[in-house]
Each structure stands twice: as C-alpha cells, then as structure tokens.
UniProtKB/Swiss-Prot annotation:
It is an enzyme of class 5 (isomerase). Pfam families: AP_endonuc_2. Belongs to the hyi family. The active site is at residues 147, 246. This is Putative hydroxypyruvate isomerase. Coiled coil: none annotated. GO terms for biological process: glyoxylate metabolic process. It comes from the Eukaryota. One of its GO terms (molecular function) is hydroxypyruvate isomerase activity.
Length: 275
C-alpha cells in the first residue's frame, strides 16, 4: 500500500506548501496531494518536489469563488466557460509538476435554488463538462476523478454525494480516463456497507482517501472504521494506486503517523511501501 500526504490537511503547523512537502518527505512519505495549490508560486512548489524527490499524485480543479459559496463548477449551469478556464489551469499545473490525476469538482447546488428543481440541468451540465474534460485530460495523458462528498455532515448542497450517483454519471459519460475518487470518510457517512461497495465499484476506482469517522482524524483514532481491514481488502482486490491521507491531525502531524508505521511494518516483504 502506498500513502500520499494531503498537504492541504496534514502538517498545518507548517505555514506553506513547500514547507509541508519537506515535512512530508521527512516523515516517510514519497508522494503528496493537494486541493488547490494555485495561490502558491509554482516555481517554489516544483522546486520543493524536486529537492525532496516527491511525487505529486493529485490536485483539484479550482473551486470558483469560495467567498460566494462555490466549491467547484463542473455541474453548475451557465458556468461552463469558467469551468474550462479552471480546468486548463489545473492541467497546466499538473503537466508542469508531473501529476497525472485531477479531481474534477462538481460544485454545490446554487444558492437560492432547490436541488429537486435543478438536479436534471446540473447533471446535464456535469456530463457535458466531463466529456470536454476527458478529451483535454486524454490529450495530456491524465485521469479525471469524480469524488462524492457527503451531504449529511460536510457539504449539504454538494451536487455529487454518493458513490451510486458518481458511478451512474461515469457510466453515462463512458470515458475510460474518468474514474471514481473514493474517500472512505464520505462513503461511510453516506450509507456505509463499505466492503460490498468497495468490491462493487472497485473497477471504477482511480484514487482512495482516508479519515476516521466521525471526527475526520487519524485512521487509528477512536471511530467506526477498521482501516487495517480496509487496507488489506484494497490490497487483496489489487489496488495499486495511492491512498491519500486527507484527515485532520489531532495534534502534531508526525506524532499522529504511528498508524502508518505500524501498518507498513506488518506488511509482508521488505519493500518500502510508501514509495
């Protein structure tokens, strides 16, 4: 199993992304992922990756106007041009930094509107934008990822909130370089049944993220999920991608990484599986 440090969440004690890349390297990671790197000087970000021999394995499309309540634009009607501009920016960053996976953020139901009245239009917009994105990403040799985000705790207005909905969209778009981003935190909240859902949707999964339920902390913190079992299940199914550590450290990030050290020590073989 290979783990990547989500530097938008881990190492909050370090003030900037280049510093967090260094901290992740010193903590045993060989890869990082990030939500939105766009406010950081790209030259400094790239230099940190190169200096510490780190891979960037995932970034997100720009969120739009966060202050106006936006969290992605791919499914928001009337914002197609802005989505495409943001996608081009994400592809530019990813190409320059050697990243081959981009999370295409669907976005929220627009303020003042009810889901039931706009859901059909949002799905049509999402499919249109995903078809466009798949072509652009395909030309760059990249994979686009769809992540369901739970609507019960985290994002009540987010358009895409269950693996079933995401899988349905993927089947309608029918593009091989579009995959499912499985965040086990969100999947557990939106129905659980993880063993069966992981097996059912495994052929679609292109990236995995983790956090414990209910407080979104380290995998070995008190909560609902047995991550040692889940890691073994993924490995048994043949998962070869990265597992992104997208959780809120309870305290010092490094002190909270004992779960990873324990798991890797228990793995068979001598290979460093963080690589």
């Amino acid at each position: 199993m290979r783990f990547s440090a989500n530097i938008s969440w881990l190492f909050p004690e370090v003030p900037d992304f280049p510093g967090r890349i260094k901290a992740a390297s010193q903590s045993g990671f060989r890869a990082v992922e990030v939500a939105w790197p766009y406010a950081t000087d790209r030259t400094l970000f790239k230099a940190a990756l190169n200096t510490h021999r780190m891979s960037l394995v995932l970034l997100n499309t720009p969120p739009g106007n966060i202050e106006a309540g936006e969290l992605g634009l791919a499914a928001v009607p009337g914002r197609q041009d802005e989505f495409r501009t943001g996608l081009n920016e994400a592809v530019s960053w990813a190409s320059d930094l050697g990243c081959d996976r981009i999370h295409i953020m669907a976005g929220r139901v627009p303020l003042g509107l009810e889901r039931q009245f706009i859901e059909k239009e949002m799905e049509e917009t999402f499919i249109e934008n995903l078809q466009y994105a798949a072509d652009i990403l395909g030309q760059a040799g990249m994979v686009g990822l769809l992540e369901p985000i739970n609507s019960l705790i985290t994002e009540p207005r987010y358009f895409l909130n269950t693996p079933q909905h995401a899988a349905s969209i993927l089947h309608k778009v029918k593009r091989p370089n579009l995959k499912l981003q499985m965040d086990l935190y969100h999947w557990q909240i939106m129905g659980g049944n993880l063993t069966q859902n992981i097996k059912t949707y495994f052929p679609l999964i292109g990236h995995v993220q983790i956090a414990q339920i209910p407080h979104r902390n380290e995998p070995d913190s008190p909560g609902e999920l047995n991550f040692m079992y889940l890691f073994d299940l993924l490995q048994d199914l043949g998962y070869q991608g990265y597992v992104g550590c997208e959780y809120k450290p309870q305290g010092d990030t490094v002190k909270g990484l004992g779960w990873m050290e324990k798991y890797l020590k228990n793995c068979d073989g001598d290979e460093d599986k963080t690589k």
